[in-house]
Regions:
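Conserved nucleotide-binding/hydrolysis micro-motifs of P-loop NTPases
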Residues: 57, 70, 77-80, 115-117, ...
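Structured catalytic cores of enzymes that bind and process phosphorylated ligands/cofactors
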Residues: 25, 32-33, 39, 62, ...
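Short, glycine/charged-enriched secondary-structure capping and boundary segments
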Residues: 21-22, 40-43, 85-88, 123-127, ...
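Canonical P-loop GTPase G-domain recognition
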Residues: 2-14, 145-193
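Conserved C-terminal guanine-recognition region of P-loop GTPase G domains, centered on the G4
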Residues: 93-167
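Amphipathic alpha-helical transducer elements in NTP-driven molecular machines
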Residues: 88-92, 119, 179
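Conserved nucleotide-sensing/catalytic segment adjacent to the nucleotide-binding pocket
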Residues: 66-105
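Conserved G1/Walker A P-loop phosphate-binding module
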Residues: 1-82
């Protein structure tokens, strides 16, 4: 169980990245996909991670220390159109550097919004993740916002758009859909040396 999740620090640039020998489980996804809500749900706390009504609120890499054992790491959202070109470039460089130069990443949760067809940026991120030797899981957020039939249809659209062979796990922060499953996965990932 993820009973003890604490915010540790934020990195706004490469120099600010946390140096640690602890495992890191990473969240990636476009702006406003629900990464902060995902963390708050796992922590069972409403305001641990700041949830923004405006997309692109998280512009830093945020580290959360879990059970005094490993880090849950929230990467900045990508693809937000109101970011300046320079902000997009900085965000992209920070994400790339963090993943490329980090041997402590044990798993990546790739979050997509179940209500919408994946964007070109989602497809690029998926292809990029495939090129890495890091295991990842696709999480389809906001699953409570659509009915069961539409949920299956949209998962199929996500799979076809990304050409994904992996399982896609529907998730809802509001209705706690598959929270137990994801906690179980995190525990398995963390126990696997």
């Amino acid at each position: 169980m993820l009973k003890n999740i604490k915010f540790k620090t934020s990195a706004f640039n490469i120099q600010g990245l946390l140096e640690t020998d602890k495992k890191q489980i990473v969240l990636v996804g476009k702006s406003n996909v629900g990464k902060s809500s995902f963390i708050n749900t796992l922590a069972n706390r409403k305001q641990l991670a700041k949830v923004g009504s405006n997309p692109g609120k998280t512009k830093s890499i945020n580290y959360y220390y879990v059970n005094d054992e490993f880090y849950l790491v929230d990467l900045p959202g990508y693809g937000y159109s109101n970011m300046t070109k320079k902000e997009k470039e900085n965000t992209s460089n920070l994400i790339n550097y963090y993943i490329e130069n980090n041997e402590k990443i044990s798993h990546i949760f790739f979050l997509v919004d179940i209500r919408h067809k994946p964007t070109e940026n989602d497809r690029i991120m998926y292809e990029w993740l495939l090129s890495k030797s890091i295991p990842f899981t696709i999480i389809a957020t906001k699953a409570d916002k659509i009915g069961p039939v539409k949920k299956e249809e949209n998962i199929s659209v996500i799979r076809k758009t990304l050409f994904a062979k992996e399982d896609i796990i529907p998730f809802s922060s509001d209705k706690k859909i598959n929270v137990d499953l994801i906690e179980h996965m995190i525990n398995l990932i963390n126990s696997d040396s």
